[in-house]
Amino acid sequence: MTKRKKKTTFERLSGMNRQQRKELQRRLYSGDPGLEVVHPDAAGIDIGNDSHFVAVAPSRDEQPVREFGSWTAELEKMAEWLKACGIRTVAMQSTGVYWFAVQDTLERHGLEVFLVNARHTRNLPGRKTDVQESQWLLKLHTYGLLRNSFRPPEEIRKLRNIWRLRDRHVGESARAVQHIQKALISMNVRLANAISDISGTSGMAIIRAMLRGERDPIKLAALRDRRVRATEKEVALSLEGVWQDDHLFELEQAVDMYDFQQKLLAGCDRKLESYLAALPAREIAAADKQAPPEEEPVVTGESTDSKKRKRKRNKGKRTSGNAPKSFDLRAELKRVCGVDLTRVDGLDVMVVQTVIAEVGPDLGSRFASEGHFTSWLRACPRPDISGGKVIRQTREPSSGRIMKGLRMAASSLLRSDSHLGARYRHLRMRLGAPKAIKAMARQLACIIYRLLTKGHAFVDAGAEQFELKRKERELARLKARANSMGLQVVPIPA
């Protein structure tokens, strides 16, 4: 069989008729890549701190690229100019926080805004200027080559902003506790060795008494709560230190910072409660409620044994110490979601609230399937296909807040006597801890998607069922391997 010779450019041109050559010449001179125009009324904006560059098609205005300032009045002029040019949709990169005001202004004027990832809009090397960047965004958006980023509704965005702000205050409180512990250790006051949480009731009572001038270890140890495991004598021994004025001042400053952060946390909790109360109660339509497959741990209906396991598990399930204490967050989340996501092993109110604050409870209208949802979370590898074959599977970094919470929830399943706990231990033994944690985080994301879209009631199938099915699969593999070698697996008589 002779190898087919590749035609040169001149040979391909000679094979064209007159009409084909004219069409090729028109495309070359006009810069038309031959793609289908998806958004004819499009514009591109290069977002900046001091100014924004806006590009429209040359046929829309004599000056197709204009620069507008970042003032509110300039943003209004930008929106009016785009409407005068007949623009309906605009593409811009999500650069820092500079795009917030631009998007709000354009949407208020009735323009559709495509917020795109900057990694998906890279231009050719050497063409990184503000004008060329806006024109490049215009060209990509005109031919429908950009993917709009997910942005939840306004009420969910408000909830997300408060929850993220609260998370920062929690981090600042933790740093204040570290400064408190540093000041105590500097005076050789080893309170943390006797009391695990110095920011708790006993720890703060003792520390505040120190700041009021009390130095007697016996009197300070008497302030401990009776639930503290360490004896009063052990606590008193840990409070014998070298009292120094500079370290006491450092301790006072750290306690003031901790109290200030706790005050800010209380304000965030009140705002969070009002935003959650404003969200409507969600009821999943009866048509969407479907019975899940039997092999999944999400099932409808409960047996007597599963009820006993659930009561035993919920009894020992602690609420996170950083959860709001001024209202019942679990009850509010159940009302907003329509299902109780905290019944899933590993998920507490903090993880569930993070999921709801980031994407909202209505996942079905935003993500077509659980595969789309986990892909958006970067919880699954991205296959690179060439020649009809998967040549590699790239794992993108998943540093989002939802995946952080799900990974923490997955790692807490190590000692869980449940179906998910047994599966995590099995994967941990096979793949190692990092891969097992990410795999279980993806499974938790799939369970959340099913619960929020189908209205399943979560009932733990139990670790025994997982082990039973695992042994059945292993036995089936052994039989298949024995048959391939002409052998037979014979059970040992009891």
Residue ranges of predicted features:
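A detector of single, family-specific signature residues
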Residues: M1-A494
